[in-house]
C-alpha cells in the first residue's frame, strides 16, 4: 500500500514539474510585435548596417566575442527580470548612454532570436527613453547566420 501511495505521489510531482516546465518554455517566447518599434528581418538589418545604421548586440560580452554580426556594436543587456512583457526594468542593467545621442537616429537591436528577451527589453528601454527609430531584429543572430550574412 505504501509503495502505491509513493508511486502515485512521485508520478504526480513529475507531471506537475513537466507541466510547469512546458508552461515556462511557452511563456519564454518574445512577442511578435512591439509598439513604437519596427520588427525587421536579417536582410533589412544588413541593408541598414551597410548604410551606417548602428546594429547593437545586446548579448553578453562572451557571446559577442564568440560570434556576432560583422560591424555590430556590443551594448550588453544584463537581464535579471522575468522574460515577460511586464518585466521589472529595475532588476536589469542597460547603458543607454552607449546609444546614439541623437534620439532621431535609427538603430537596430538583436540577440539570440525569439527566446532571447535582451533585445526586446533594450528596445523597450530605448523607446521609453525617447528614441524614435528603433528596429528590432527579432530573429537575431540565428536568422542572420541562416541567411549566410557576414559574422566576425
Identify what each model region corresponds to.
Residues 2-66, 152:
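Flexible, polar/low-complexity N-terminal or interdomain linker segments that lie immediately upstream
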Residues 46-107:
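Positively charged, proline/Ser/Thr-rich regional signature most characteristic
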Residues 91-138, 142-143:
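Catalytic cysteine-centered active loop of the rhodanese-like fold, especially the PTP/DSP P-loop
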Residues 60-64, 79-82, 113-117, 140-144:
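Solvent-exposed loop/turn segments at secondary-structure junctions
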Residues 144, 151-152:
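Short, solvent-exposed mixed-charge patches
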Residues 30-35, 80-85, 109-114, 131:
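Second-shell loop/turn segments in exported
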Amino acid at each position: 500500500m505504501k509503495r502505491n501511495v509513493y508511486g502515485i505521489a512521485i508520478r504526480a510531482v513529475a507531471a506537475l514539474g513537466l507541466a510547469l516546465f512546458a508552461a515556462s518554455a511557452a511563456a519564454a517566447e518574445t512577442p511578435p510585435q512591439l509598439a513604437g518599434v519596427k520588427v525587421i528581418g536579417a536582410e533589412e538589418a544588413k541593408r541598414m548596417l551597410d548604410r551606417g545604421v548602428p546594429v547593437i548586440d545586446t548579448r553578453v560580452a562572451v557571446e559577442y566575442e564568440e560570434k556576432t554580426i560583422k560591424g555590430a556594436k556590443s551594448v550588453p543587456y544584463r537581464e535579471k527580470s522575468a522574460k515577460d512583457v511586464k518585466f521589472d526594468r529595475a532588476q536589469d542593467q542597460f547603458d543607454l548612454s552607449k546609444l546614439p545621442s541623437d534620439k532621431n537616429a535609427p538603430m537596430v537591436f538583436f540577440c539570440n532570436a525569439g527566446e532571447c528577451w535582451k533585445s526586446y527589453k533594450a528596445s523597450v528601454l530605448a523607446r521609453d527613453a525617447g528614441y524614435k527609430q528603433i528596429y528590432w531584429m527579432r530573429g537575431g543572430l540565428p536568422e542572420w547566420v541562416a541567411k549566410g550574412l557576414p559574422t566576425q
